[in-house]
A protein has these predicted regions:
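C-terminal substrate/ligand-recognition segments
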Residues: 238-354
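An aromatic- and glycine-enriched ligand-binding surface/loop that stacks and positions planar moieties
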Residues: 82, 101-278
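Conserved, well-structured interaction surfaces
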Residues: 1-48, 62-75, 81-96, 289, ...
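Long, intrinsically disordered, low-complexity segments
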Residues: 1-4, 76-78, 99, 157-219, ...
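Short coil/turn linking the two alpha-helices of tandem helical-hairpin repeats
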Residues: 45-46, 52, 117-126, 342-343
C-alpha cells in the first residue's frame, strides 16, 4: 500500500510540470493519483489505525514519518478525496481500452464511506464525538441521483464476481487484474503476480486436498442466515447461490429456477464430494461439520489441474477483478447514513434504497428502515467482500458478535 501511495505522490508532484494538450485528461490523471493516495491510506488506517502519512516523496534515504493521530489521518484522506472528486471525470469519459479506471463516482463513494466510518469508529474509541452523517449521505446521494454517471444494480447478482462481467454498471471501484499470472508478488511492477493468492485458499476446492488451506469454510450461523432468507415465491435467496458452494440437494434448500450449485467442470455436490451428506467432512477432515465455503472472486472456468502449476493448486493466482465498491453497497451505506441522523438528499428514501437491493433478488420488502434491517441486509448482500469486520467496528459490535459467531 505504501508503494502505491508513493507512486501516487510521484504522479501528483510530476503531473503539474507536464504540458498536456488535453486539460481534462491531465485532471483525470491527477484525480486518480489523489484517489489512490486516499484509498491506500484509508485501507491502512482502518486496518492498522496508527499509521504514518506519506504526503510527499522522501527527500532523504532515512526520512521517517511519525504516526499520525486519527484526526490527522481522516482529515488527510478526506481532503484528498475532495480533490479527487473535483478532478475526476464520470465513467463515460474513458474509452473501452480504459474501462475500469477510477471515476468521479469512485471518489464520491469512498468519500461517503470515509465520513460514515469516521462517524461510527471514532466515538467508539473516544477520540471524537463529531459525526459526519450529513456529509456521508450527501456524497452517496451524488451517485444515487446520477450526478456522476449512470449506475444500476445488474440483473444477475452473481455477475458481480466473475470475469465475464467485470467493470459492469454496478461496479463503482474495481481493482483490475490482467490475468492469472503465477509469478511472485512484486509490488510496483505491472507484471507483479499473485502467487499464493488468498482467494484460492478461501474455497474448499483447493486442489491440494491435504493442505490446511482446504478448510476455509463459512460458519454455520451464516449458512442458517441465508437459508432463512426466501424469495416472495418461497425459494432460497439467489444470493446464496452467487456467494457460496454448498449442497443444494438437501431439504432446506429450495432452488430458484435455473440455479444450481456446481463445482469445477460443472460437477454437482455428489459428483465432487462423493457423498450426499450436507457437510464437507467426508472429503476434508478439517472442514468436518461445515456446510459451505466462498464462491466469490474465483474463476470457475479455469481448468482444475492437480499439478503444481494449476490454478487451484495450493493458492495459485486467480484473475477475477476485485469489486471494491458496488452500487448496492452505496445504497445500503446511504440508508445507514440517513438512519443515523444524516439529511436525506437522494431521490429515494432509505427504505426504498434497502428494498431496491432486495428487489434485485426477489426477496420481500422490509417495512422499516432501521439499523437492524440494514445490518441484516449487509450480511446477505456483501458477505465475503471485505466489509463485515469494519461494519461491526463502526457499529461497536466486534466483541459482542465475535463471541456469538464462533
Amino acid at each position: 500500500m505504501y508503494t502505491a501511495a508513493s507512486q501516487a505522490n510521484q504522479m501528483i508532484e510530476s503531473l503539474t510540470e507536464i504540458e498536456f494538450s488535453n486539460k481534462e485528461l491531465q485532471d483525470a490523471y491527477l484525480g486518480e493519483a489523489y484517489f489512490l493516495r486516499a484509498f491506500t491510506h484509508f485501507f491502512l488506517f482502518i486496518n492498522y489505525r496508527n499509521i504514518p502519512l506519506i504526503k510527499e516523496l522522501p527527500k532523504a534515504p532515512n526520512e521517517y514519518k511519525p504516526q499520525a493521530t486519527p484526526e490527522e489521518a481522516w482529515d488527510f484522506i478526506i481532503d484528498d478525496l475532495i480533490k479527487a472528486k473535483d478532478l475526476l471525470p464520470d465513467k463515460n469519459f474513458w474509452d473501452a481500452k480504459n474501462k475500469g479506471r477510477v471515476t468521479k463516482a469512485s471518489a464520491y463513494a469512498l468519500l461517503g464511506k470515509s465520513y460514515l466510518y469516521r462517524s461510527g469508529i471514532e466515538p467508539k474509541y473516544g477520540t471524537s464525538q463529531t459525526t459526519y452523517y450529513n456529509e456521508a449521505a450527501a456524497a452517496f446521494a451524488e451517485i444515487i441521483n446520477g450526478n456522476s454517471g449512470d449506475y444500476r444494480l445488474v440483473d444477475d447478482y452473481s455477475c458481480n464476481f466473475d470475469v465475464a462481467h467485470e467493470n459492469n454498471d454496478e461496479s463503482i471501484f474495481e481493482v483490475q487484474f490482467v490475468g492469472v499470472l503465477n509469478t511472485g508478488f512484486n509490488p510496483g511492477f505491472v507484471d507483479s503476480g499473485l502467487f499464493n493468492d488468498v482467494r484460492c485458499k478461501m474455497c474448499i476446492m483447493n486442489r491440494s486436498r491435504n493442505s490446511n488451506s482446504s478448510a476455509q469454510v463459512m460458519h454455520n450461523w451464516l449458512y442458517d442466515k441465508f437459508v432463512a432468507s426466501k424469495t416472495v415465491t418461497g425459494e432460497t435467496d439467489p444470493r446464496m447461490f452467487g456467494s457460496f458452494v454448498f449442497n443444494d440437494n438437501v431439504s432446506e434448500i429450495i432452488r430458484p429456477k435455473g440455479m444450481k450449485v456446481t463445482f469445477l467442470e460443472g460437477k454437482d455436490w455428489e459428483a465432487e464430494m462423493g457423498s450426499k451428506e450436507g457437510t464437507f467432512g467426508e472429503q476434508y477432515e478439517l472442514a468436518m461439520g461445515y456446510k459451505m465455503c466462498s464462491r466469490k472472486w474465483l474463476d470457475w472456468t479455469l481448468p482444475p489441474t492437480d499439478d503444481a502449476g494449476g490454478h487451484f493448486f495450493n493458492g495459485r493466482a486467480q484473475g477475477v477483478n476485485w469489486r471494491m465498491i458496488r452500487y448496492s453497497d452505496v445504497l445500503l451505506m446511504y440508508a445507514e447514513a440517513v438512519v443515523m441522523g444524516g439529511k436525506a438528499t437522494a431521490n429515494i428514501t432509505p427504505l426504498e434504497a434497502i428494498n431496491k437491493v432486495r428487489d434485485r433478488v426477489g426477496v420481500p420488502h422490509v417495512t422499516e428502515a432501521n439499523m437492524r434491517t440494514i445490518e441484516d441486509e449487509r450480511i446477505l448482500e456483501l458477505t465475503y467482500e471485505g466489509s463485515r469486520f469494519f461494519d461491526l467496528l463502526r457499529w461497536g459490535k466486534v466483541v459482542e458478535l465475535s463471541l456469538i459467531h464462533i
